């Protein structure tokens, strides 16, 4: 029996019975469903589609969490440029626009999943009508719906949205084996999810923020497993630090006797180099 298991993400292009069966036959041990791109009813349908074809395969439901996305018009930014965003354009909820968990001068805002780096020079107004002025450190083209990261801020209160809670209820009712919790920052985030799911579902903490990496031991103690989510982790940390962070996550999981998962960008290099 292989000690290392394979998780395969399935979506619209791979939800046919033939492809699901082929994925499992090829060695997939767990099929992952990403809640970021499907509503709650669609999630239920996808779970049942997998169960109908291969009831023996485990399912991991990956909830969206507090992911921010740019909702403004496409723009191109030049190095050194000063520009302004509204809170609405950055997708900021009230808890991340003001107060203890809000934006402060000198903090970074990363756009297009880290490709564009800016630093805050001014925050004006109150949510939802306020705005933030930034200086561009590394420019580029920004398209609508691209990711926004705030590596220097911490989400205060619950990391769960109303959609996350509805998706967790579906996962519980459909007896899903694993749930991945996005943008975990502290052990209480996992405890909140576990209180909603009950004792039978395994809770996986996705480590993709610096705050979670600092608390990795405590998070491991309340989780069934941890995932080194290299995509967002590589955005919020300097890229040269990611291999060491990934190693730390895996070693801490082993020491605590919980599952360790390495995920995202696993095959991305093959799009440009088939021998990478």
Question: Which role fits each region the language model picked out?
Answer:
Residues 1-276:
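Non-catalytic helical/linker scaffolds that mediate oligomerization, partner binding
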């Amino acid at each position: 029996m292989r000690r290392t298991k394979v998780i395969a993400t399935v979506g619209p292009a791979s939800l046919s019975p033939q492809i699901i069966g082929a994925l499992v036959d090829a060695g997939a041990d767990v099929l992952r469903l990403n809640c970021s791109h499907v509503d709650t009813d669609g999630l239920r349908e996808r779970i049942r589609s997998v169960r109908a074809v291969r009831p023996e395969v485990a399912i991991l439901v990956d909830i969206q969490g507090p992911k921010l996305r740019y909702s403004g018009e496409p723009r191109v930014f030049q190095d050194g440029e000063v520009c302004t965003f509204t809170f609405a354009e950055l997708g900021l909820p009230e808890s991340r626009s003001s107060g203890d968990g809000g934006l402060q001068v000198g903090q970074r805002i990363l756009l297009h999943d880290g490709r564009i780096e800016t630093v805050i020079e001014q925050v004006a107004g109150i949510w939802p009508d306020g705005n933030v002025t930034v200086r561009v450190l590394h420019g580029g083209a920004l398209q609508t719906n691209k990711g926004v990261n705030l590596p220097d801020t911490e989400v205060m209160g619950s990391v769960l949205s109303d959609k996350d809670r509805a998706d967790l209820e579906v996962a519980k009712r459909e007896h899903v084996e694993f749930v991945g919790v996005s943008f975990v920052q502290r052990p209480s985030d996992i405890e909140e999810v576990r209180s909603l799911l009950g004792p039978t579902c395994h809770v996986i903490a996705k480590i993709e923020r610096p705050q979670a990496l600092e608390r990795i031991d405590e998070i491991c103690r309340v989780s069934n497993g941890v995932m080194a989510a290299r995509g967002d982790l590589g955005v919020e940390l300097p890229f040269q630090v990611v291999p060491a962070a990934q190693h730390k996550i895996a070693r801490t999981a082993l020491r605590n006797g919980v599952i360790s998962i390495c995920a995202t960008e696993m095959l991305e290099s093959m799009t440009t180099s088939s021998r990478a």
